Amino acid sequence: MERGRTEIACILPSISDQFSLSMVNGILSAFPMDSYICHLFQSFNPSLENRLLQKCIDTGISGIVLFPQDQPFFSEQLLYLLLQKYPLVLIDRNLPRLDTSYVIGDNKTGGALCLRHLHALGHQRICFVSSARRNTFTVRSRIDGILQEAEARNIPESSITIWDFFNKHQPYVHYQKQMMKLIREERITAFIAAESTTCAYLYSLFATMNLRVPEDISLMSFDKPLVESQRPDFFTHISQSEYLMGKEAGTILKHQIETRDPQVTHRVMSPLLEVRKSTRAIVL
């Protein structure tokens, strides 16, 4: 520990896209540089997350902002932090039955906004694609929002295709046949990507299949994708205000540390639909 400055940790699954970078910058904005040191860690998997939490405990880190991995059981480290009333704020994902502070986006509403937007454009058969498994907290909430909105609009659940555990590291040719089947046989006309990186992959995949966005297929995403061949304002997306989410999480943690007040605080950030050029009405 460095004398004179309080050391905190920020642990995210990865810090590799605009969403996570913006979130980290929001967290850092809450802590004056002259009085805090923030250690940034990438956890990548549950096992490494647990080791990082243990390292923070062993070295006397004063507080943690954690974007938690999705695990079937709470780790010993998380339970220890909870019992010790340790300054801890979860971000972007809360863990049911774990009574700790969190700042998350309203993923169910975000899913509903996606479905509502595409249905208003005339899309009746839609595919939701995620690189994570459908039972993870965030993905499950987004799917619930999509399906509930579909039910409210009398769209049969069979018209919504859920494609989870999508591997963005596969060569495009790996998915071309399966994707063409969805479009030609199942008549999918619009895709919702659960992650900005998945959206970018799908856009490039469609290009290899001579499918144009949005002329041939509509594509939208959670969070703002970045694709070299397109301007930053091209993609219709759900904005989760990740910078503000990070700033709010940092502010809560800073208050806990400086006041020694373990009071649990919950914040849910409202999503915004940003309509751009990657979605358009069905042309009959």
Where are the regions a protein language model picked out?
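Short beta-strand elements in bilobed, periplasmic/extracellular small-molecule ligand-binding domains
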Residues: 31-43, 147-172
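Flexible loop/turn connectors
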Residues: 180-284
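Alpha-helical recognition/docking segments in bacterial nutrient-uptake
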Residues: 1-116, 180-186, 197
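An alpha-beta-alpha
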Residues: 114-153, 265-281
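Short, solvent-exposed amphipathic alpha-helices that sit
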Residues: 18-33, 110-113, 137-156, 201-205, ...
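Hydrophobic alpha-helical segments within soluble ligand-binding/sensing domains
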Residues: 103-128, 171-180, 199, 240-259
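Short acidic capping loops at alpha-helix termini that bridge into adjacent secondary structure
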Residues: 124-125, 157-160, 213-218
